[in-house]
């Protein structure tokens, strides 16, 4: 039974891989939803790569799921949150976005489609801008994934998150896509008991 469950689980991972055109199934992580996916990234990336005074760039149209985790990190580590403004048409001001980058910018996290305005943000262009500054990019695809083709390799997204229920999947399931080279650099988000029980005096592996 456990083997069958594992096979079904990995088959689901392959389905998601094909759906978003990830390079491999090891780049697909299952979570409890978009919110947990973002919290995972903020926690792991923030702990590993961000110090007091470092900066994250988000947009003015983010869902609270992509605001509050960064605010908590700011309270805990003293990072700065920079916000991309928009015009009267509900479009992000890309010239202002470019100006927000500094040597302290560590990551950008922006929604692909606004859940309030319906604005489709040019995330492929925005990712290219971030990469030109050597900065990784998180795409919140919770609202875009049901309505448009999302190809992580075409976007060149470093991370991308969404929830299964948005595409008629089960509730309580989410996806975190991450490029393998980034996932390999992130520390564990949570721990668990594996096949052996390490002594509290020993380090975890």
Report residues per predicted region.
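Pyridoxal 5′-phosphate
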Residues: 1-197, 201
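N-terminal low-complexity segments that are often proline-rich with Ser/Thr-Pro
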Residues: 203-205
